[in-house]
Amino acid sequence: IFNLSQDAELINGTYGIYYKIQQIALFSCFRLSNTLISLLAFNIGLNNKDRIKECIKWGIIDTVIVAGIITIIFEVLAGPISKLFGLTTTGENKGQIITLCETSIRIASIGYVFMGISLAIQGILQAYRKALSPLLISTLRLIIFLVPVSLIFVRQSNVVNLVWWAFPIAEALTAVLSILILKFTEKIIAVKKEKQVI
């Protein structure tokens, strides 16, 4: 994505730092998603409809809350976090990279709440023993939405600041589709259960 001649080194250096920082948010949400899989799968096995609904509701809410807290922390501490993770950066662009990293954190972390929704729904779908739907959601987040949106921003003159908007946009679009996929999956499961009763 970042093959931009004069801005390439700056963006690649910044992305290298941002990627490490993003993992904090990503893995925090993954832990909740993995916990949700176990709890929800257990209640699906018991066919406890009330507990299933509660697990889904609170699984999504808890993941969004954690993602929201991380977003607030990153927005407030973007500067110190960038400097901390940028300690290993060398070269004449070090100051620019750290400044740009601060910008990238402030912009990209807006999408963490949407990422929390998507990751929680991936966990829910895995608990329902659906393997392809979570894979589709990951592909939407990381490739199908992110790459085209990034390519649009890459063509702009202020690419070093604009390209980071690709992350929250891709996360928001993925969250919307994740919700639709979950609703569709729940309808299919309900229809199958009705047929089994008949």
Describe the predicted segments one by one.
Residues 1-18, 24, 42, 82-92, ...:
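Helix-terminus/linker motif at the lipid-water interface of multi-pass membrane proteins
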Residues 8-11, 131-133, 159-160:
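Membrane-helix interface segments
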Residues 15-78, 115-137:
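Small-residue-rich hydrophobic transmembrane alpha-helices
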Residues 24-25, 76, 144-145, 164-165:
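Hydrophobic alpha-helical transmembrane segments of integral membrane proteins
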Residues 40-111, 153-198:
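Short alpha-helical transmembrane segments in multi-pass integral membrane proteins
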Residues 119, 145-154:
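Transmembrane alpha-helical segments of integral membrane proteins
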